[in-house]
């Protein structure tokens, strides 16, 4: 899917980690929530409330999930799951474009 139909989009950007991660929230007609954004080169740790599926649209990243013995690499066309009430570390060397699917 290259776009979302009839989405309600938050106009103000979410800016995290001094601008290293920038996203916009959107809600689809069925009530599902997503964020679409970019992560600039950095190593960042994110905490989750709800479960997330991180879909990589462009770029590449190394991800270490909480309690995982090793990191894994993901690139465009791949995704990874993060449990709710957890955390993960993501290392990005070139700009990463992503969609985060919540819940």
UniProtKB/Swiss-Prot annotation:
Its EC number is 2.4.2.1, 2.4.2.2. The keyword Glycosyltransferase applies. It is an enzyme of class 2 (transferase). It catalyses: a purine D-ribonucleoside + phosphate = a purine nucleobase + alpha-D-ribose 1-phosphate; adenosine + phosphate = alpha-D-ribose 1-phosphate + adenine; cytidine + phosphate = cytosine + alpha-D-ribose 1-phosphate; guanosine + phosphate = alpha-D-ribose 1-phosphate + guanine. GO terms for molecular function: guanosine phosphorylase activity; purine-nucleoside phosphorylase activity; thymidine phosphorylase activity; uridine phosphorylase activity. Keywords: Glycosyltransferase, Transferase. Catalyzes the phosphorolysis of diverse nucleosides, yielding D-ribose 1-phosphate and the respective free bases. Can use uridine, adenosine, guanosine, cytidine, thymidine, inosine and xanthosine as substrates. Also catalyzes the reverse reactions. This is Pyrimidine/purine nucleoside phosphorylase.
